[in-house]
Regions:
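Long, acidic (Asp/Glu-rich), low-complexity accessory segments flanking structured domains
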Residues: 2-194, 207-246, 310, 317, ...
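Structural alpha-beta junctions
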Residues: 272-288, 335, 383-390, 471-484
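Well-ordered, non-membrane alpha-helical segments in soluble/globular domains
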Residues: 230-240, 266-279, 363-377, 414-427
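Aromatic-lined glycan-binding groove of carbohydrate-active enzymes
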Residues: 299-409
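A cross-family signal for N-terminal binding/gating loops and helix N-caps
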Residues: 142, 203, 260
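Structural recognition of the beta-strand scaffold that forms the well-ordered cores
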Residues: 162-165, 197-201, 217, 252-256, ...
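Intrinsically disordered, low-complexity acidic segments that are enriched in bulky aromatics
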Residues: 221-275, 281, 288-289, 298
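A generic structural motif
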Residues: 254, 280-296, 397-398, 453, ...
Length: 488
C-alpha cells in the first residue's frame, strides 16, 4: 500500500500558503561516499540567509535534491490533503508564506517531536510550531505559545472554564519515590514555566489538633511524595507565588484533597487552609464559583475536594469557601460534581495494560465534549463574571495506574496515553465536517478543558502541553474580532 499523501492542518489564527517543496536524502542515508548528515546540517544552518542549498552543495548531491514551486493556501483551522507523496528515505522541506514572510520546516522532524518553523527573514512577525506524525504523513501547524505567559494572549473577560489548560496529576510527585507513587518528571517550578496552570495537590495535616500549626505534608494516597523526607505544601505555595510575581498575567488553579494515613479530617484541613494560607485576597481566589480570567490574574484559584468546617459554610454569602468539588465522582468516565461546576473524566482503575485503550477512549470522548462548548464573551466585566460562573470546568485526567502491576504504573501508562492524545489533538480535535465552516460556532470553541497529565516534560518533551495550548486559538480569534483591547 502506498503511503498517504501529505496532509496539513493549520491550527493557527493566521492564513498560510505552502509555496515550495524541496526533497533531499535523509541524514541517515549515504550515497557516493558523501556524508549527507554534514550536508543537511549545513543546509539547515542558513536560518536567515537561504531557503535552498548553495550551488556547490547542489552539484555535489544533485541526484538526491529537487525543488518545486507550489501554491497551496490553508486557511486558519483548515485541514488540506495535498498530492505530495513521501518518497523512500527523503526529507521534505516545506516553505510556507504569510503576509510576505516565509517559514520553513523539514519533515520528518528530529526525534519526531515538535519543532519551531525556521523564519527566513530577520525580525519575523510570527512564530509557528509544527508537529509531524509520520504514520499518517500529517503536519499540524500552530502558533507557538509563550509557555511562561500564555494567558497574556487572552482578554480579562475570558471565562476561565473556556480555556484549554494543561495540568498535572499529583503535581509534586517528582521527587525520588516509589515508582507507583511518582507521577511527574520535573518540579512544579519547571511545570509552571512550561505552561502548566492546573496543579493537583494531595495533603495530610501534620498536627491537626493544634490550631497554630500550618503543616500540610504532601502525599500521594497513603504514601509520602518523597523517600528522603517530608515535603510541605507551604514550600509549594511559595514556588507558585514566585512564579505569579514574575508572570502577573497568569493564574494557577489548584485542586486540593486530603489523603494520607493520618487521622485528620476534612474539616480540620479546611480550617488550616483558611487560617494559615488563603486569607490574602490579592493572592487567592476563594469564591465558590468559576471566575473570569481578569478576576484571578496573579492569583491561585482553589478547587476544594474536601468538606468544609461548619464555621466556614457561611462564607461568600452562604456559598462557602472555594470551588466546590467535594462530591467528586469516583473512577468515572463522565461524571458531574453535584455543584454542577465540574464535569470530569477520571477513570483510573486500569486492571491490565490492555485496558489502556478504554482509558484513551474516555479521554478523547471528554475532549470532544469540551470542544463543543461555546463561551459567552462580553466586554462588560460584570456580565463576563456572571457568564463565567455558568460554564463548568471540563476536567480530563489522562492518568491511571494499578499498584500491583508494574506495566500499569503511572510512567508506563503515560508512555502509551500521551502520544495518542498528541496525535488526537493534532489530527482530530474539533475537526469539522465538509458542511461546517472551520470557525463556525456549530463546532464550538475547540477547547480541551483542563487536561491533567502524568510525566510531561520527560527529557524536555513538552509536546502534549504545547498541543493543548494550541487549542486556545479559536477562542483567541473570536476575541481578536471584538473591539476591546487584550490584557497588558
Amino acid at each position: 500500500m502506498a503511503p498517504p499523501a501529505l496532509t496539513i492542518r493549520n491550527l493557527s489564527t493566521t492564513p498560510l500558503e505552502l509555496k515550495s517543496l524541496e526533497r533531499f536524502e535523509s541524514a541517515e542515508g549515504k550515497a557516493s561516499g558523501v556524508n549527507i548528515t554534514r550536508i543537511t546540517r549545513s543546509l539547515t544552518g542558513f536560518m536567515y540567509l537561504n531557503s535552498t542549498p548553495t550551488s556547490p552543495q547542489l552539484a555535489e548531491k544533485a541526484e538526491s535534491f529537487s525543488r518545486q514551486d507550489v501554491s497551496i493556501p490553508i486557511a486558519p483551522f483548515e485541514t488540506k490533503v495535498t498530492d505530495i507523496e513521501p518518497q523512500g528515505n527523503q526529507v521534505l522541506r516545506l516553505t510556507f508564506e504569510t503576509n510576505g514572510e516565509r517559514y520553513r520546516i523539514d519533515t520528518p522532524t528530529p526525534l519526531h517531536r515538535s519543532t519551531v518553523l525556521t523564519p527566513l527573514s530577520h525580525n519575523p512577525t510570527y512564530e509557528f510550531t509544527g508537529v509531524y506524525l509520520p504514520k499518517y504523513h500529517f503536519l499540524a501547524i500552530f502558533s507557538s505559545a509563550k509557555l511562561a505567559s500564555w494567558m497574556s494572549n487572552l482578554k480579562d473577560e475570558t471565562p476561565l472554564a473556556a480555556l484549554s489548560i494543561p495540568g498535572t496529576h499529583n503535581s509534586p510527585t517528582y521527587h525520588a519515590a516509589l515508582p507507583s507513587v511518582r507521577c511527574q518528571a520535573v518540579s512544579v517550578k519547571e511545570q509552571l514555566n512550561n505552561g502548566i496552570r492546573f496543579l493537583d495537590i494531595r495533603v495530610q495535616p501534620q498536627d491537626p489538633n493544634d490550631p497554630a500549626a500550618e503543616g500540610l505534608i504532601l502525599v500521594h494516597s497513603a504514601f509520602p511524595v518523597s523517600l528522603t523526607g517530608h515535603k510541605y505544601f507551604r514550600d509549594l505555595v511559595n514556588h507558585v507565588k514566585v512564579f505569579l510575581d514574575a508572570n502577573p498575567t497568569e493564574t494557577v488553579i489548584m485542586s486540593i484533597k486530603r489523603e494520607g494515613i493520618g487521622k485528620a479530617t476534612d474539616q480540620q484541613l479546611s480550617q488550616i487552609l483558611n487560617h494559615h494560607y488563603t486569607q490574602d485576597s490579592t493572592r487567592w481566589f476563594t469564591g465558590n464559583r468559576i471566575p473570569a480570567l481578569g478576576e484571578v490574574r496573579g492569583k491561585i484559584v482553589v478547587i476544594r475536594r474536601f468538606g468544609l468546617d461548619d464555621s466556614l459554610k457561611g462564607e461568600n454569602n452562604g456559598t462557602g469557601l472555594y470551588i466546590d468539588a467535594e462530591s467528586w465522582p469516583d473512577n468515572c468516565a463522565d461524571g458531574v460534581c453535584t455543584s454542577g461546576e465540574i464535569r470530569v473524566q477520571d477513570f483510573y482503575e486500569v486492571a491490565e495494560s490492555s485496558n489502556i485503550e478504554k482509558k484513551i477512549g474516555y479521554s478523547t470522548d471528554q475532549l470532544e465534549r469540551a470542544a463543543k462548548t461555546v463561551a459567552v464573551l462580553s466586554e462588560d466585566m460584570g456580565v463576563a463574571s456572571a457568564e463565567s460562573a455558568k460554564q463548568p470546568f471540563f476536567m480530563n485526567f489522562l492518568s491511571a495506574s494499578n499498584f500491583w502491576r508494574a506495566n500499569c504504573w503511572p510512567d508506563k501508562i503515560a508512555e502509551k496515553v500521551n502520544p495518542v492524545i498528541v496525535d488526537y489533538l493534532c489530527r482530530r480535535h474539533s475537526e469539522t465536517t465538509s458542511s461546517e465552516q472551520p470557525d463556525s460556532a456549530s463546532v464550538g470553541d475547540g477547547s480541551t478543558g483542563i487536561v491533567v497529565c502524568d510525566w510531561v516534560g520527560t527529557d524536555g518533551d513538552w509536546d502534549l502541553v504545547r498541543c493543548i495550548l494550541a487549542m486556545n486559538a479559536k477562542l483567541e480569534l473570536r476575541e481578536k474580532d471584538r473591539p476591546s483591547d487584550p490584557p497588558s
